[in-house]
Amino acid sequence: MSEELNEHMQVRRDKLAEHMEKGLDPFGGKFERSHQATDLIEKYDSYSKEELEETTDEVTIAGRLMTKRGKGKAGFAHIQDLSGQIQLYVRKDMIGDDAYEVFKSADLGDIVGVTGVMFKTNVGEISVKAKQFQLLTKSLRPLPEKYHGLKDIEQRYRQRYLDLITNPDSRGTFVSRSKIIQSMREYLNGQGFLEVETPMMHSIPGGASARPFITHHNALDIELYMRIAIELHLKRLMVGGLEKVYEIGRVFRNEGVSTRHNPEFTMIELYEAYADYHDIMELTENLVAHIAKQVHGSTTITYGEHEINLEPKWTRLHIVDAVKDATGVDFWKEVSDEEARALAKEHGVQVTESMSYGHVVNEFFEQKVEETLIQPTFIHGHPVEISPLAKKNKEDERFTDRFELFIVGREHANAFSELNDPIDQRARFEAQVKERAEGNDEAHYMDEDFLEALEYGMPPTGGLGIGVDRLVMLLTNSPSIRDVLLFPQMRTK
């Protein structure tokens, strides 16, 4: 296979040398286009063959040569740009001998520029009849075979550029991703939020339960952590009086890779002063519905075998009620840590001997309920042990004013009425430090600088974090997070 490939590559290099000997630049410069491929198809598709023959408008397009056929003095080809493909009709007597030799020697994958007029073939295909043909970039490697290339899913991720060339669905996914993030910004800016940027390297990792990546700052000779969340710096801005802020940025967690997880991923976090988690629920469903309408024109989408209705209002369910509905176990009752672990064993829920009541409730939910939540559902009231940055619920202090959003059995968002009591926050951090000492390496660190900021006073605040990659998965019907990351993390070959 390698000898065959090298032979093909040598042929292309020989053609490259021939072009250069003739004074042609096989890696040209700027090329002005008048249209993209699908613009022309949409504009002229309604024209009859005869009507198109009467038009004299010249068009100029450019793209990658994807097919080529024909012998003698005429040939057909398809070129592809970001918008799609369009057919070319190239005749020697129209473009001249030299340009036709360039066309004849062109290989699939070459990037070409064409000026011509529109016409429709006998079978009704909108095409460009070339008057000028120019090689813009010589491709020195053959593309994967049309029907046999890039079937290897791992190759698609490792060589995303080939995937984008050969797979229009993949191109569409990443165009949609850009639209999703743009729509997110438009909505929040329209609601008066201020977009900010905060550091990606932290002296103390915080804002989430996760293992961080560690790096070293040579000039300062200190260890730094790639951020595992955006949260704590944005809360400092709330203390500073920036009342509605958001950030869209990369977050890094030194954890496993799966269809739902990548060590480097994109989040949006936002905070609104004088709001609580009920307000943030409403904002979340309106934000996601707005994005769906912008991308799909509808709040009804398809994901896998499911039809998902994103039209507000979404289901709201307390975590204890969700567990009770699924298993019959009632955690509203006063239950000791030992009794909670015994209930877990009885119902086949995997827990460790160090887990408290709140951790057990969460394990019940994750193992028995989470994957059953197909339509958008806000699960709220998480136990205080697993929510160190959320306000306690005033009616039952075992729980917090927190919610997570689940769609198609996956968490898509996490939000709180933010804890702004520095004394309570210190106690929560101390409990987390104890957990870390007992072996939970995802427990929160003590963060004295953040506590000092809270002591100056943070207004009552509602906060939200959304996993952008998972939202893109949902809105593009993509089964794996790697399908929505241009360059996902891969094991070194």
Swiss-Prot record:
UniProt cofactor note: Binds 3 Mg(2+) ions per subunit.
Gene that produces this protein: lysS
HAMAP family the UniProt entry points to: Lys_tRNA_synth_class2
Protein's recorded name: Lysine--tRNA ligase
EC number per UniProt: 6.1.1.6
Keywords: Aminoacyl-tRNA synthetase, ATP-binding, Cytoplasm, Ligase, Magnesium, Metal-binding, Nucleotide-binding, Protein biosynthesis
Binding locations of Mg(2+) 2: 411
Subcellular location as annotated: Cytoplasm
Record flagged with keyword Protein biosynthesis: yes
GO process annotations (BP): lysyl-tRNA aminoacylation
UniProt xrefs under PANTHER family: LYSINE--TRNA LIGASE, CHLOROPLASTIC_MITOCHONDRIAL, LYSYL-TRNA SYNTHETASE
Molecular function terms, GO-annotated: ATP binding; catalytic activity, acting on a protein; lysine-tRNA ligase activity; magnesium ion binding; transferase activity; tRNA binding
Record NCBIfam families: lysS_bact, PRK00484.1
Family statement drawn from the similarity comment of this UniProt entry: Belongs to the class-II aminoacyl-tRNA synthetase family.
